[in-house]
Amino acid sequence: MASGEDRISALPEDILHQVLRLLPAHEVVRTCLLARRWRGVWRSVPTLCFTGAKGWGSADRFAQFVDHLLHLRCGGDGAPLDSCDFDFDSDGFMLLPANERHASIWLWKALPRVRALRLCIVEEQEASPLSDMHLFSQHLTRLELVGVGINNSVVDFAGCPTLVELSMDTCDVFVRQLLSPSLKHLRITRSYTSEFDRILISLPNLVSLEFIECRQGRIPFLGSLPRLARAVVVLNEYCADQCSQDRFDSCGADSDICDGCYYYYGDPGHGPHYDRNNCIFLKGLSEATDLELSAHSDVTVFNRDLKWCPTFTKLKTLLLNDWCLAANHNALICFLQHSPILEKLTLELSKGPLYETEAEGIYKPLGQSIASNCLKIVEIKCANVDSKVHKILEILTTYGIRLEQISVQQTSRIPGSGCFNFVCTEFS
């Protein structure tokens, strides 16, 4: 500026806070050297973001800085904190056990003061473990963990009565129970779970659930979720709930032949054991209004649950992929007959022939009636209108759905032209 006037320093403090919250913590602290006006601004910025030891010369110097700053900000006289972010992504800091202990201590220091806490430790190694997940905070509302190893037998967030959102991405989640009386939103993505035991999820106030493309292990066992409104579940080829004998019911083989069935209801040698005459997963989703259930063709858990399929009394929108076409489309028929107020059904079909299996379906259709008189539209999204689509149209019309209610979206009609959509009027 020609006049040399410092207009930035003249801004209100809340505006300065909005600018500084975009910077890592060490750069925020350095602003105290800019001018007299800036000397104390860093002390009241409502966010802290630590970006790892890179550039500090040594991990010890970085650790000393974090220790001192957390002492100043999280002590009794520190200004309130909206959020604290520890981002150690790919800087190597967590490779040393001593630094893992530092991270656990910092988490405990920040926890009582913040409303949102994020810990990110993504490196080319196993997830870094947290020494203790028995957390206590009267203020924490959101917790995000990335690349963290959780090995407690029970993770109980009763000590965080205001926690409403928990997100875990690329984590090792080797726990038997996940409990919280307050949690409303749970997201577990690309994580590792046990191949021998399921996570019992007991969250009476849960509103939304996302369990997406976990890299190992079994789908959780869902307790009662009376407030659940929406769930998105994507099970890929790494899900351990598969039968090596291609059966939807248990093949009865021992662990040398089929781990998928042998450990389906828990480790017979150690437990816990789940009720063999009840759902593992679908019953916990029965209160939802919006469901997306996608699975690799080898995954059996959804089809096994159909034997005890609950009635989805509130379900209005449903998305399924190819897994529902196995065993004479029994899963598709089952959902149609157990969703009395369903308004919209979406079927996302992959390329390739109709999924065939020698296994007999567990669910036996209830005649040829369809439960929902509320159904407005069925959307079929496919690469090509082939025999698979024709078979689905035949099934849908057999169970009372009119062709004019069905919309087919063909995604590969002309390369680069996007989606081709049409409403069915006839098929042969």
Residue map of PLM features:
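Non-core capping and flanking segments associated with repeat-based/extracellular domains
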Residues: M1-S428
